[in-house]
């Protein structure tokens, strides 16, 4: 899962808030947007060979780079210049995805206010909601839901935002998503539900939280027998704490 939301640094590259940038790959316009140099950006756009929607070798526009680096003034200026808001880069990521991925909430808010689509998917079918959940930002998740982001969107692995929260062991996010109506019985491509994924991870409080939501007690997606037994034990412990406690004492006495 972590590989879906991580960025790998190559030789001669510098990290730039979610984009690995090499100077030789950037046009002057893109470099200005990346560093937030609004004055230079305006100067370049007055030259005919530069266009507000110009893409680099990886199909990134100035808006992508400004959003990735949190330059709200540049974002507002580019939108005023009628730039495309839902344009995609080489990984199918929109400027909104980059803003959320890099946790630049102000940039994300601006884009949403100007009609950015919260349900566009990147090359792995992740939406902005997947990235917001992975970034553990409750405020971003709440904002995206206000703009009707799809709470049940699945990426290529079949993970909904709720499953991402469970995999990342984030009880607060799990509880928040459930309160917002997330399907507690949604499953991934291997038929693993939130409960099954929670049993195999930490902390165990996630299991209790999910069981309190009336989750379906199905363990068909658990291939490992040891994990299956753990699943059954934890369910029994939640449902019949007195029985399991006394059973454990008898076993220990023997």
UniProtKB/Swiss-Prot annotation:
InterPro entries the UniProt entry points to: Ankyrin_repeat_domain, Ankyrin_rpt, Ankyrin_rpt-contain_sf
PROSITE patterns documented for this protein: ANK_REP_REGION, ANK_REPEAT
GO terms under cellular component: centrosome; nucleoplasm
Tissue specificity of this protein: Testis specific.
Organism expressing this protein natively: Homo sapiens (Human)
Repeat region (ANK), residues: 58-87, 91-120, 124-153, 157-186, 190-219
UniProt-recorded name of the protein: Ankyrin repeat domain-containing protein 7
UniProt keyword list: ANK repeat, Repeat
